[in-house]
Amino acid sequence: MKVLDLLTVLSASSLLSTFAAAESTATADSTTAASSTASCNPLKTTGCTPDTALATSFSEDFSSSSKWFTDLKHAGEIKYGSDGLSMTLAKRYDNPSLKSNFYIMYGKLEVILKAANGTGIVSSFYLQSDDLDEIDIEWVGGDNTQFQSNFFSKGDTTTYDRGEFHGVDTPTDKFHNYTLDWAMDKTTWYLDGESVRVLSNTSSEGYPQSPMYLMMGIWAGGDPDNAAGTIEWAGGETNYNDAPFTMYIEKVIVTDYSTGKKYTYGDQSGSWESIEADGGSIYGRYDQAQEDFAVLANGGSISSSSTSSSTVSSSASSTVSSSVSSTVSSSASSTVSSSVSSTVSSSSSVSSSSSTSPSSSTATSSKTLASSSVTTSSSISSFEKQSSSSSKKTVASSSTSESIISSTKTPATVSSTTRSTVAPTTQQSSVSSDSPVQDKGGVATSSNDVTSSTTQISSKYTSTIQSSSSEASSTNSVQISNGADLAQSLPREGKLFSVLVALLALL
């Protein structure tokens, strides 16, 4: 068997395959391992199984075996632990490898990795499609100063100038952050957050554009049975007496830029336009994937892209709803508190275009001297007539005997004699417009238009005058629901006025 064919099936870098064009004898172990990763090429065969779509984003720390990847059961050792993943080549023919259980159709990947050392030892992290599109990141153990980037389109190896080398500080001794951003218009390779290479989709050598799975593993490019070109590229012949050779992966982040359950080749053109997303769309979650990646790269977590979108939407809706409710409540409270509309009128009905019903204003009076039906209503004539909560407003009294005094947070003067010290509560509760009137200490609250009957006034005034006739200068103390106490002394003239009003009411 040709080593070129063997390496292609193994999904190893096509750059390596280029140097392996010469014939060589492959071992039975290598042949068996190679056949286990063989896939159906939809550009050459019909009826290939659709590719399972990732259609989400995730971060994997490999503290235990991962649901996202399958151990290909090649010879070698794979361990999981608190420090992440280790893949060890302990002897000849070992080739520990993990393959993703999903495909992405464009996406972004990040790996925190320390490459294996050792002459001829190759550490690999790459994307590959069923029709042999490929995007690579590779390290050779004998070179502790750089890593390599490469790409291929449809397995085309007619030219060999696709690979590039990038300087990096001791990659076999230190962990570094390597990132691939495979977008529709370009692919970008990053080292520790810095762009080191950009490939445009207008490349004359083609551009990867079909669904790809993720592979990672370690193998011996310097095996003495390999072609001379492969051994040279890998840095020389591998000395297995120096084994074991281990590569380490601390974390992997993967995002898919597309949505759907499966990706299918619609024809044999191999173009991205021919790819069909079952139940989704190509590039349908690009923006969401960027958000997911940012969260995951900063140590955050998400359950899935759909959950993330739903959560963001729900959160936004909740925030808006909360803000609106808070604003309405605050506005209503502010309106009632700042409206100084002490009004003396005949069976007057105070109305408002506002539908807010702060009917929970439950001020109580310890000593009610002029306890007419002092009514708090959410129906304020207009927001435009509001004054600040600390403002005072003088309202002329009416000649009628029936009074409706709208409660206010600050004293207001009626005919320059009577002052109301009744203030509505500043805390609003959700009470429907048809909720019953709450009466505490002679202060009635209702969201309906309020009227004060002659009988109510007469009764209340009479009762009040009798209970407080001995108190010439008593304090009218009002207990507001938030615990604040306000007290004002009612002038003597005010009492006389109250008596006069009560007598008129009896006529």
From Swiss-Prot:
Disulfide bonds join 40-48. Glycans are attached at residues 117, 177, 201. A lipid is attached at residue 482 (GPI-anchor amidated asparagine). The GPI-anchor is attached to the protein in the endoplasmic reticulum and serves to target the protein to the cell surface. There, the glucosamine-inositol phospholipid moiety is cleaved off and the GPI-modified mannoprotein is covalently attached via its lipidless GPI glycan remnant to the 1,6-beta-glucan of the outer cell wall layer. GO terms for cellular component: cell periphery; extracellular region; fungal-type cell wall; incipient cellular bud site; side of membrane. It holds the Pfam family Glyco_hydro_16. It is a lipid-anchor; GPI-anchor. Present with 44000 wall-bound molecules/cell in log phase YPD medium. This is Congo red hypersensitive protein 1. It comes from Saccharomyces cerevisiae (strain ATCC 204508 / S288c) (Baker's yeast). The gene is CRH1.
